[in-house]
């Protein structure tokens, strides 16, 4: 089995920075219906406290010959605004509430919020 980490990077979300908690949690529920809750995690892509030069560096590799703005534009190449319900790591509390409200029980919610990743990596042998 594998894992799918649901990204919270605004450019990856329905309605980008305006994505609602309910919409995000509904996406997770649909994925659980397809592949099972044990294969789902959160891949926050959270990058706080860094200047915009960091995202510019990430989008332009050492050998890039032209400027790449990724999902951004020349006019707005900075980090996108996070959804209001996940501006930093404290947003995991909002995710917990949202997942419970959408119908996940406590064990499933804890699995999605970290236990599944832990168990996945624990199972990898060198």
Go through the PLM ranges and name each one.
Residues 11-15, 48-51, 118-120:
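Flexible loop/turn segments at secondary-structure boundaries
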Residues 77-126:
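Mid-to-C-terminal alpha-helical segments outside catalytic/metal-binding sites
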Residues 1-40:
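Catalytic pocket-lining loop regions of alpha/beta-barrel enzymes
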Residues 20-33, 57-70, 96, 125-126:
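Short, electropositive alpha-helical surface patch
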Residues 4, 45, 109:
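Conserved, mostly hydrophobic/aromatic
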Residues 2, 29-36, 51, 100, ...:
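Hydrophobic alpha-helix feature that most strongly marks membrane-spanning transmembrane helices
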Residues 8, 35-81, 85:
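Short acidic/histidine-rich active-site segments
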